[in-house]
Every structure is written in structure tokens, then in C-alpha cells.
């Protein structure tokens, strides 16, 4: 039997309007519960050259390794982003989605807008099936021609709504904080894989790209309406900011069962994506997840995707191939150009948008 860690740690999960206190000492697997990781010791030392020698960092790194190996999803607390900001992001997102449809269409997503902007319910497809959500899609902005012919598909400014008025400024501040947080979590993951804290920050993350999906899931009167079909995230690392009072995100565990990602106020849910699977030489596997909002209430989720450089040729890093050699030839070893991979995903997801544009 593997014990998570020896120190008794208590955290909370909000469910059915009350708090259950969980003794993490007793959690020996993640078959019904996602791990909760306080990363504050990591953040306190993240800019120190000798951070890997700090006892607090070592403990966090061990937890990250266990979570990434066993489930690929975990809650992040102690992340340094204020509850006020996290809640304000969700509050103003609700305000946008409550607007009349005609108002939301002012920032309609189109191919000529670089696939940036608002999409109505049913425009997004996962594995060929319609998803029952509406969303605003945003990407890191870049100068025309910066990424050559591949990048032309996504060229253009993000389309931020004029109502709420402060939304653009709020979200740009939030994006910067999520970018910094993601970089620091990846330093811990790099240590967990046996490298230095900075293995990802050379040719892979010198100029990191990002994607943000601001998603609204309507309340339903029938069960098991698929808000977003089962998928893995195609990027590097995801931070999910979800409503505190509705459980809709489900994660597939090692036994093939779907377990709920019950909201913890003030936390992020973090999960690894396909690019990290490749870079880690398959040590960490991206995990299938889906969204089913069985609540009659409207639910919002703001998902921030931290990515490699747009033009990065993603393949297993040498240090991780050395630390974690693989005997078999697998898909993991194949090189992927991130930007092309992203464009392929966008064009597949919005194939109908292309046809009808």
C-alpha cells in the first residue's frame, strides 16, 4: 500500500452546501477523489537557484509527481491569486452570458476574425458531436506574419465584449497571473521528472503561447446532457476556474470510472495535456474528461491553457528520455509542431463554421 505522505493534512471539499474535512493521510489512491496540493512552498522558492534542495519544495514536488502519474488532474491551492479576482472573473463571465443573444453576437467568432470571439450553443464539436455550451475563445495575440502561413488562421485581436465594461482589463490581468502560475507549476513538474526546474523553459517555453476558453453551460431539465464531450487537452497545462456550487466536470480514473471534480472554493483544477505527455516521454499521461451539467442552474468555467512556443517542435526532452527510457516504440516519440497541431484542432472543431462562413 502506498501512502500519499506521512504528514496529516486537512483540506475541504464543498458539497451539498457543507464542508467535509478529508484526512489526506488516509488517501492511498485517486480512484474516487482528486488530490489537493498546496503549492505555496514551491512558489516561495520558485526563483531561487537552489529551490530543489528546499524541504518544502521537495514535498510539493513529490505530490505533483504522484498526481501526474496516477490521475493527471489535481486541485491547486496556495497559488497566490486572490479569491476576489477568481470570483470576479466568474461573476463578470456570468454577466456576459446573461446578455441577450444579439448582444453576444457583436463579437461573433468567424474564420476572418481568427477564430476568436463568441460562439453560440452547439457550434463547438468534440469527437464529431455537438457540445451544449456557449463560449468566448481567446488566443495570445501576435503580429501579422509572425508565425508564417500556419499562423495566419489565428491572426487578429481577441474580441472582448464591451459589456461588462471592465471585462477586458480584468481578463488581461487574470491571464498574466495564470501565465506566471503555470510557469511555476511546470518548474515543480520538471523537478518531479528528474530534471532541473528549467527544463521546459529553453526552446519549448521561451515565448509561450496560451489559449483561453470562457465557457457557459446552460442549466438543463434532463440528465446527462453533454456540455463538452470526453477529450484530453491538446496543450501543455490547464488551469480551470469553475463555479463553486455546481459539480459538472468529470475525470476518467485508472479503472475507467468517471469521478466528479467537486469544486473547492478558491482553488484551480490543474490537468496535464498531450504536449506534456510527449515532453515527459510518456511518464505523465493526459487524462480524459468531460462536462455534464445536471444542475438546473447556469454554470461557467474559465479554462486557461498554457502552451509551448507556437513553433516548438515538441518531442521527448533528452533529459527525460535519459531518466525515463521506454522499451517500446510508441506514439509518444513522434514529433509534433505545436502551432500546426493547434490549427488542426481548431479547424476540426469548427469545421461547420468554415463551411458556413
Swiss-Prot record:
Co-factor binding comment: Binds 1 Fe(2+) ion per subunit.
Broadest EC class assigned to this enzyme: oxidoreductase
Deletion phenotype: Lost accumulation of guanidine in response to methyl jasmonate treatment (MeJA). Plants missing 2ODDC23.1, 2ODDC23.2 and 2ODDC23.3 produce reduced guanidine content.
Description of activity control: Slightly inhibited by canavanine (Can), the 5-oxa-analog of arginine.
Entry keyword set: Cytoplasm, Dioxygenase, Iron, Metal-binding, Oxidoreductase
Gene Ontology MF term list: 2-oxoglutarate-dependent dioxygenase activity; metal ion binding
Expression induction or repression: By dark. Triggered by methyl jasmonate (MeJA).
Binding site for 2-oxoglutarate: 299
Reaction equation(s) it catalyzes: L-homoarginine + 2-oxoglutarate + O2 = 6-hydroxy-L-homoarginine + succinate + CO2; L-arginine + 2-oxoglutarate + O2 = 5-hydroxy-L-arginine + succinate + CO2
GO cellular component, one term: cytosol
Tissues/organs with expression: Expressed in senescent leaves.
Binding site for Fe cation: 231, 233, 289
EC number of this enzyme: 1.14.11.-
Main location: cytoplasm
Protein location: Cytoplasm, Cytosol
Source species, domain of life: Eukaryota
Needed cofactors: Fe(2+)
UniProt keyword Nuclease present: no
Functional summary from the UniProt entry: 2-oxoglutarate-dependent dioxygenase catalyzing homoarginine 6-hydroxylation and arginine-5-hydroxylation thus producing 6-hydroxy-L-homoarginine and 5-hydroxy-L-arginine, respectively. Guanidine (Gd) is in turn synthesized by the spontaneous conversion of 6-hydroxy-L-homoarginine and 5-hydroxy-L-arginine to (S)-2-amino-6-oxohexanoate (RHEA:79843) and L-glutamate 5-semialdehyde (RHEA:31527); guanidine is a nitrogen-rich compound that may serve as a defense or signaling substance.
Similarity remark: Belongs to the iron/ascorbate-dependent oxidoreductase family.
Listed name of the protein: Homoarginine-6-hydroxylase 2-ODD-C23.2
Organism this protein belongs to: Arabidopsis thaliana
Amino acid at each position: 500500500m502506498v501512502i500519499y505522505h506521512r504528514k496529516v493534512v486537512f483540506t475541504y471539499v464543498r458539497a451539498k452546501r457543507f464542508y467535509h474535512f478529508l484526512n489526506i493521510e488516509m488517501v492511498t489512491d485517486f480512484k474516487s477523489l482528486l488530490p489537493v496540493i498546496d503549492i505555496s512552498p514551491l512558489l516561495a522558492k520558485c526563483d531561487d537557484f537552489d529551490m530543489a534542495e528546499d524541504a518544502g519544495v521537495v514535498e510539493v514536488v513529490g505530490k505533483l509527481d504522484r498526481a501526474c502519474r496516477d490521475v493527471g488532474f489535481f486541485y491547486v491551492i496556495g497559488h497566490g491569486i486572490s479569491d476576489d479576482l477568481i470570483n470576479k472573473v466568474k461573476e463578470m463571465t456570468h454577466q456576459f452570458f446573461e446578455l441577450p443573444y444579439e448582444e453576444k453576437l457583436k463579437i461573433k467568432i468567424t474564420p476572418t476574425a481568427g477564430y476568436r470571439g463568441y460562439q453560440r450553443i452547439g457550434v463547438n464539436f468534440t469527437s464529431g458531436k455537438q457540445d451544449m455550451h456557449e463560449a468566448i475563445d481567446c488566443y495570445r495575440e501576435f503580429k501579422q506574419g509572425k508565425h508564417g502561413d500556419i499562423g495566419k488562421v489565428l491572426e487578429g485581436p481577441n474580441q472582448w465584449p464591451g459589456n461588462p465594461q471592465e471585462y477586458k482589463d480584468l481578463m488581461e490581468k487574470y491571464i498574466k497571473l495564470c501565465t506566471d502560475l503555470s510557469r511555476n507549476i511546470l518548474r515543480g513538474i520538471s523537478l518531479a521528472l528528474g530534471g532541473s526546474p528549467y527544463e521546459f523553459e529553453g526552446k519549448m517555453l521561451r515565448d509561450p503561447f496560451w489559449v483561453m476558453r470562457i465557457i457557459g453551460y446552460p442549466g438543463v431539465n434532463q440528465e446527462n446532457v453533454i456540455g463538452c464531450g470526453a477529450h484530453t487537452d491538446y496543450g501543455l497545462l490547464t488551469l480551470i476556474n469553475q463555479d463553486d456550487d455546481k459539480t459538472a466536470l468529470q475525470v476518467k480514473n485508472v479503472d475507467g470510472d468517471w469521478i466528479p471534480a467537486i469544486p473547492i472554493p478558491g482553488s484551480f483544477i490543474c490537468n496535464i495535456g498531450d504536449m506534456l505527455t510527449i515532453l515527459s516521454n510518456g511518464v505523465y499521461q493526459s487524462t480524459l474528461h468531460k462536462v455534464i451539467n445536471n444542475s438546473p442552474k447556469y454554470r461557467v468555467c474559465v479554462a486557461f491553457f498554457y502552451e509551448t512556443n507556437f513553433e516548438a517542435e515538441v518531442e521527448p526532452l533528452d533529459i527525460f528520455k535519459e531518466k525515463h527510457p521506454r522499451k517500446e516504440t510508441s506514439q509518444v516519440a513522434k514529433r509534433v509542431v505545436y502551432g500546426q497541431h493547434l490549427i488542426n484542432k481548431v479547424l476540426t472543431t469548427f469545421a461547420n463554421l468554415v463551411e458556413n462562413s
